[in-house]
């Protein structure tokens, strides 16, 4: 199994690469790519860690050598948020980066599963889909927006509030991956109940958690380490499912049946070909139903922006 990380010299990319080097199954290959000249050195650094995962790093304009034969491609390349910026302020720079890299994926490993980490995910996934379509290689079961950070944050905050072990809590999060489009389904967490105020406060904290980190880092960066962990969790789940493990479920932002929006984050059963089944979002509370209806305009606009970017 070969996994490629594009944007591997950045804060998320390095954290992700470290976790994959230590946790991918023995015999896996890991290839790192970034425009930055330091990238081969990041691979050499990681190569000294004693795990049976072969690693190589590539830099420059051409990602081809990193992509050849890749089964999974995780894209974290782009600029990070600064204080006062919304994820959508990143759009102008990151849209071009994602378009370029996905064109290279389409050419070199068209059958790979692609996980988009680069923000704004609501829009960059739509860009990737249009690029893959134009190249004639789009498979909606193999393109994912990685929203796992919303899930791990939800798990952490709920566990803290309710005195649970974080590993025992799993909160489904649906919708998109910024602001009001992030909707944790707190009513579906087994064995835990919340007051209306707790639901309102937790939902807001989960939606604004990225800003919490940006402000705490005081201009020195955004959520890179927790995002690296989230991306690793998603990437490793995908690898396990591709290798035939049964019952692997993760939430991610994918093209579905369009019931809510063309792209929508929901629980997915993963399998040998990517998405095996888009699972139902279940019964929502009145608060969640309201929040869902209230986000759809924003989500649809974000998606339209991506489509327009590629077709302009």
Swiss-Prot record:
Pfam families named among the record's database cross-references: Ldh_1_C, Ldh_1_N
Natural source organism: Shigella flexneri
Coiled-coil spans in chain: none
Bilayer-spanning residue ranges: none
Highest taxon above the source species: Bacteria
Quaternary structure (record): Homodimer.
Gene that encodes it: mdh
The protein's name in its UniProt record: Malate dehydrogenase
Amino acids binding NAD(+): 7-13, 34, 94, 117-119, 227
N-terminal signal peptide: none
Similarity field: Belongs to the LDH/MDH superfamily. MDH type 1 family.
Protein function: Catalyzes the reversible oxidation of malate to oxaloacetate.
Enzyme class: oxidoreductase
